[in-house]
A protein has these predicted regions:
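Short, surface-exposed ligand-recognition loops at beta-strand->loop->(often short) alpha-helix junctions
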Residues: 11-19
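A short acidic, often aromatic-flanked loop/helix-cap motif at beta-alpha or helix-coil junctions
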Residues: 96-99
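Flexible, low-complexity linkers/stalks enriched in Thr/Pro that connect modular domains
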Residues: 43, 91-94
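Short, well-ordered beta-strand segments in beta-rich or mixed alpha/beta enzyme
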Residues: 3-11, 40-68
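An amphipathic, aromatic/His-enriched active-site/gating alpha helix that lines ligand/cofactor pockets
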Residues: 26-38, 57-91
Length: 99
């Protein structure tokens, strides 16, 4: 069972929603090349225009740090000002239960 996770809150700038979704598709492609990232999901929050979440899981802190410092993390940081109305908020989580 994965023990470590990240939850990222994203708020698209008005009118940038389609660009954000294309960016998230690109991020998914980058993350597929990360052996330590066990799962990665990007989702749009229903009923909250422009609000997105990313949730990903890892077996250990080393893998989580590699992900944050890797290409996907760098791309998120580099594009944050262009795509998002507020700085993305990254929560470091410890998984306590799963199906």
């Amino acid at each position: 069972m994965p023990k470590f996770a990240l939850l990222v809150d994203l708020k698209a700038k008005l009118g940038k929603e389609s660009e954000v979704e294309a960016f998230l598709e690109k991020e998914a492609t980058l993350v597929r090349g990360e052996p330590g990232t066990l799962s990665w999901h990007a989702a749009k929050v229903e009923g909250e225009p422009g609000v997105y979440k990313i949730f990903d899981t890892f077996n250990d802190e080393v893998a989580r740090e590699a992900h944050l410092k890797g290409e996907a993390g760098q791309e998120l940081a580099a594009n944050a000002g262009k795509l998002f109305s507020v700085t993305p908020k990254v929560y470091r989580l410890q998984v306590v239960a799963q199906k």
